[in-house]
């Protein structure tokens, strides 16, 4: 009888441990999603809203003069996007949440800011200007292409 009690207690302990681990990881996933939402809200308020005021033509003009104040301001705003992209690419932030929030927006933003990005890369060929942002956009593009394939195949 004592053997059955010991086995039952051990099984209950194992199940409790497994449940505790599951709860812990579920909490981590939720915290990561919440951190993504919080970081994106800050990014939107401090950066994306300002970048929305520029057009690709305007960015092209600004990119012609790297000494201009607007060039420096745009570079600083893009640096914040780069920092956010690092968080997404290193899985600190949840890429699925980012896709749901702004996948098309980031693709359009990269396209709009490309003249400035290319200018910075021309000036300093050894530096990695906005590589993480570009990696995020490419990842989003691959995901969108897969989604299109799936929907066109009727799956």
Where do the model's predicted regions map?
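Membrane-proximal alpha-helical anchors
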Residues: 2-68
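An amphipathic alpha-helical interaction surface
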Residues: 71-79, 83-155
């Amino acid at each position: 009888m004592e053997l059955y009690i010991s086995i039952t207690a051990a099984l209950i302990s194992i199940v409790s441990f497994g449940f505790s681990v599951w709860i812990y990881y579920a909490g981590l996933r939720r915290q990561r999603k919440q951190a993504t939402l919080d970081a994106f809200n800050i990014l939107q308020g401090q950066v994306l809203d300002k970048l929305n005021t520029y057009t690709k033509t305007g960015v092209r003009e600004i990119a012609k003069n790297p000494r201009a104040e607007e060039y420096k301001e745009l570079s600083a705003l893009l640096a914040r996007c780069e920092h956010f992209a690092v968080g997404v690419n290193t899985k600190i932030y949840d890429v699925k949440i980012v896709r749901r929030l702004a996948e098309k927006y980031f693709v359009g933003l990269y396209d709009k800011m490309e003249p400035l990005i290319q200018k910075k890369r021309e000036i300093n060929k050894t530096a990695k200007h906005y590589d993480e942002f570009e990696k995020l956009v490419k990842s989003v593009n691959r995901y969108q292409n897969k989604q299109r394939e799936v929907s066109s195949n009727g799956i």
